[in-house]
Amino acid sequence: MSEQPTRFLTGITPSGTPHLGNYAGMMRPAIAATRTAGCENFYFLADYHALIKTQDPARIHRCTLEIAASWLACGLDPEKVTFYRQSDIPEITELTWFLTCVTGKGLLNRAHAYKAAQDKNQEAGRDLDDGVNAGLFMYPVLMAADILIFNAHKVPVGRDQIQHIEMARDIAASFNHLYGEHFTLPEALVEEQVATLAGLDGRKMSKSYDNTIPLFAPPAQLKKLIGSIVTDSRAPGEAKAVEGSALFQLYQAFATPEEVAAMAQAYADGIAWGEAKERLFACIDREIAPMRARYEDLMAHPEKVEAILQAGAEKARALAVPLVQRLRHAVGLRRLTEQAVSTDKSKSAKLALPSFKQYREKDGKFYFKLVDAQGKLLLQSLGLDSPRDAGHAIAQLQQQGAAALAALAPQIEALSDAARAEALQALAQLQAYAASE
């Protein structure tokens, strides 16, 4: 059987045209990663999420076009990835409700964004939930639905988003426990060394500091902004330090290794700041100019972007629709004729079955176990490297029973003869139940 590709999912909140720091730190490496063999990539415009903070329809509409055009102009290939708009997948909102109904309020109370809003209100002497809408509170459930609708294995996130991936895992595990193994437990993929660029004033390039260089700034504006980069007072002919130089750091992000070495030597030889800025402009514009032309074309022809997003939505829904159909059946939203045929399969009968539990321990490893209806441990795995490995092992045991138990022996704690017999009996029960559905 061919190995299933690792599925990655990346959400992009529509927030306007990116700047050079966004491009070098996140967009360029993310697009390069889509060319990795053995990976299946999903990129989506998180316009539902944008509604939590923005109630300006014109801005939502404009920013969605700008960010979609930006990613496409920078090289995101819709033939190699599934690129879609969140609001074009109605199954996401249906799944959000299914997940809402198995998510404890206490879990959502602990979400960092919600707690931060409450802490801010407390410091200001306001009601704890002042200004907090239900969208912010339910954000983790919608994010879980974004991930689970495609059973993504890995979700690239910053450290501030790790908790949301862990919450998605908890929600998926709760649903699996109640209704059977429908979801892969996702894993956060944290980039430890994200490149950050210095802005015009030497601080980290950020819209909040008003020190950014827009990614697709016209050549004249780009040259003017580069000319305003803060430098020290060292005169031409006076050696200059590359360390701490915002100009040099920007140059490094766009130049070849040979060019970087030459610029470092030029610093040591006392290059004039004006000449250094001319070199920086030429270096950046060389990479950005072709992308700028594509961006301007896409912005002038939004129908091209819309067609790409609709094609992506069609690809995405080819996976989402059958999954939600299975989930509707699993939770009991079926045709009445189906219900009549299945009256003997009550919830109590389902809960009387053995079940698999999948979880992560503090050692970072992933584990699964088989327990009977009373919670007695029948089978315990050893630590596995990924949730995907655990999910595959569970699927093998559910489908192949005794054969899988023998094949997976190196991944399972040793069993006595009596324990093996109990485990085999439990697996047979699960197979019989699955065959009768």
Model-predicted segments: where are they?
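Conserved nucleotide- and phosphate/pyrophosphate-binding catalytic cores
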Residues: 163, 172-363, 373, 377, ...
